[in-house]
């Protein structure tokens, strides 16, 4: 029993999909062991009297039989099963739930829309970096949750009865992707939103985070098409035009959109456009977790960390036995360089955070081998679970670590989409210099330096006589100037 007592499972019986998440608690954080998702499309089985069809219920039970096999090894007190919008609505939900409990061998709780919204917010708060004050949007199959909050506390919670399955059945039933279908779907969504918009705006937010299949699909499309990961109204409108151009739902083809997500994508897109328009949202990013993560963290009674990225970096440093003092030393030098050039280069605060994060992890490759350490570092960072970092930010960190020393691979810096290519180049230059000047691994051996930027020219001024007194240091700096010059990054050292 010992090896299973640290296992926890969260099951979400959604209106579009059923999901199961199995995790292991490791030193106050969670390690994902299993994620299973099945498209059950329960909401599509509701008739005009809100009764679930036998076929829809059978699809659900069939899925739960798969889940039940995995649950046998987990203590019942460490399993939570919740049902959302469709089972709140269905007049025969009792029949479905009775059999579901029999199959799973544990209670199934039908949660209110507000409780669902609260759990979604907790899942986001535990797994998503960025500003403290946030608006969270989750478009489900039959309901949409909108939550504002600061840190771990929610300030307003709304669960609205519109979702990508119900809007599909209502506004895209003819399977046409016409302008009029989108217009009707958006208009209806805006009417549902209007009564709650004022209160959401009153509480306000600094960042907007999306936590649903629709937003996940958008992220996958944008990554596949090499765009940056920020979702904007302009991008949503472009995708709508692309969908209209395809004409029919069965002919919908967009680079990066999987067949599995395509069916409910137009309806989800229409709802999201309405949310952006009605709430005047400038940009949205993808959340690291939502309802299932909220359930798991709730069972574990873990406090929400103020800075999720810092917790992630600490855990990784411990796990891979990174020299934390050295990581801090490099980070301090890099931060000093960044502060000296940020105005000339018009760098944003998030770029500073990502540079410091790269410094904290730059020696992770040594845990594999000194040979090709940068390649090992890039591989590890690209493939590790890093709560608080978006997929594009992970890719940027991996690219910076790949280019921390040796000749520079410019194309890799241009293939990431977390920041503009020029910014990635600038962060890479600062990281490389910081690693060089902290390489003696002692604070008292880091020289006092000034770094000036004039367009792309960097001028580094060292203490009088430093280059003469440090012949190896001079050789390393000369080599670095040469490597940077190969990719047209002028560097002068005095």
UniProtKB/Swiss-Prot annotation:
Pfam families reported for this sequence: Ppx-GppA (PF02541), Ppx-GppA_III (PF21447)
Coiled coil: none
EC number: 3.6.1.40
Catalyzed reactions per annotation: guanosine 3'-diphosphate 5'-triphosphate + H2O = guanosine 3',5'-bis(diphosphate) + phosphate + H(+)
4Fe-4S recorded as keyword: no
GO annotation, biological process: guanosine pentaphosphate catabolic process; guanosine tetraphosphate biosynthetic process; nucleobase-containing small molecule interconversion
Pathway: Purine metabolism; ppGpp biosynthesis; ppGpp from GTP: step 2/2
SUPFAM superfamilies given in the database record: Actin-like ATPase domain (SSF53067), HD-domain/PDEase-like (SSF109604)
Family annotation (InterPro entries): ATPase_NBD, GppA/Ppx_hydrolase, Guo-5TP_3DP_PyrP, Ppx_GppA_C, Ppx_GppA_N, PyroPPase_GppA_Ppx
Superkingdom to which the source organism belongs: Bacteria
PANTHER family xrefs: EXOPOLYPHOSPHATASE (PTHR30005), RETROGRADE REGULATION PROTEIN 2 (PTHR30005:SF0)
Biological function: Catalyzes the conversion of pppGpp to ppGpp. Guanosine pentaphosphate (pppGpp) is a cytoplasmic signaling molecule which together with ppGpp controls the 'stringent response', an adaptive process that allows bacteria to respond to amino acid starvation, resulting in the coordinated regulation of numerous cellular activities.
Family of this protein: Belongs to the GppA/Ppx family. GppA subfamily.
Name of the protein this chain belongs to: Guanosine-5'-triphosphate,3'-diphosphate pyrophosphatase
Gene source species: Escherichia fergusonii (strain ATCC 35469 / DSM 13698 / CCUG 18766 / IAM 14443 / JCM 21226 / LMG 7866 / NBRC 102419 / NCTC 12128 / CDC 0568-73)
């Amino acid at each position: 029993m010992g090896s299973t007592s640290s296992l926890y499972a969260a099951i979400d019986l959604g209106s579009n999909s059923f999901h199961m998440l199995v995790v292991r608690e490791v030193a106050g954080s969670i390690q994902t062991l299993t994620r299973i998702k099945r498209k059950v499309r329960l909401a599509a089985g509701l008739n005009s009297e809100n009764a679930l069809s036998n076929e829809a219920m059978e699809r659900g039970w069939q899925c739960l039989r798969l889940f039940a096999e995995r649950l046998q090894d987990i203590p019942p007190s460490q399993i939570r099963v919740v049902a959302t919008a469709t089972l709140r609505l269905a007049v025969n939900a009792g029949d479905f739930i009775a059999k579901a409990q029999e199959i799973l061998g544990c209670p199934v709780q039908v949660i209110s829309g507000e409780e669902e919204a609260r759990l979604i917010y907790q899942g986001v708060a535990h797994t998503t970096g960025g500003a403290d004050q946030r608006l969270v949007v989750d478009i489900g199959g039959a309901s949409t949750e909108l939550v504002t909050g600061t840190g771990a506390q929610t300030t307003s919670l709304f669960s609205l009865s519109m979702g990508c399955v119900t809007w599909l059945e209502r506004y895209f039933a003819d399977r046409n992707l016409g302008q009029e279908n989108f217009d009707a779907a958006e208009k209806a969504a805006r009417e549902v939103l209007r009564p709650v918009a004022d209160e959401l705006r009153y509480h306000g937010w600094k960042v907007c985070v999306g936590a649903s299949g629709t937003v996940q699909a958008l992220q996958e499309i944008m990554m596949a098409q090499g765009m940056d990961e920020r979702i904007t109204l302009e991008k949503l409108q472009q995708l709508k035009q692309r969908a209209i151009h395809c004409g029919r739902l069965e002919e919908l083809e967009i680079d990066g959109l999987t067949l599995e997500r395509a069916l409910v994508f137009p309806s989800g897109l229409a709802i999201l456009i309405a949310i952006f328009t009605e709430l005047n949202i400038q940009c949205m990013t993808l959340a690291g977790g939502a309802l299932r993560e909220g359930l798991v963290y709730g069972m574990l009674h873990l406090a929400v960390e103020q800075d999720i990225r810092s917790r992630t970096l600490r855990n990784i440093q411990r796990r891979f036995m990174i020299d934390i003092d050295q990581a801090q030393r490099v980070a301090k030098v890099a931060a000093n360089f960044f502060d000296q050039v940020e105005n000339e280069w018009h760098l944003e605060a998030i770029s500073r955070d990502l540079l410091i994060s790269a410094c904290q992890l730059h020696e992770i490759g040594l845990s594999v081998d000194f040979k090709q350490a940068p390649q090992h570092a890039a591989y590890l960072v690209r493939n590790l679970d890093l709560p608080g970092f978006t997929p594009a930010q992970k890719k940027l960190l991996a690219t910076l670590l790949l280019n921390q020393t040796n000749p520079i691979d410019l194309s890799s810096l241009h293939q990431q989409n977390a920041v503009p290519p020029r910014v990635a180049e600038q962060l890479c230059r600062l990281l490389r210099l910081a690693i060089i000047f902290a390489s003696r691994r002692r604070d008292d051996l880091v020289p006092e330096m000034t770094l000036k930027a004039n367009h792309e020219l960097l001028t580094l001024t060292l203490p009088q006589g430093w280059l003469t007194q440090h012949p190896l240091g001079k050789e390393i700096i000369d080599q670095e100037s040469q490597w940077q010059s190969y990719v047209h990054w002028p560097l002068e050292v005095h």
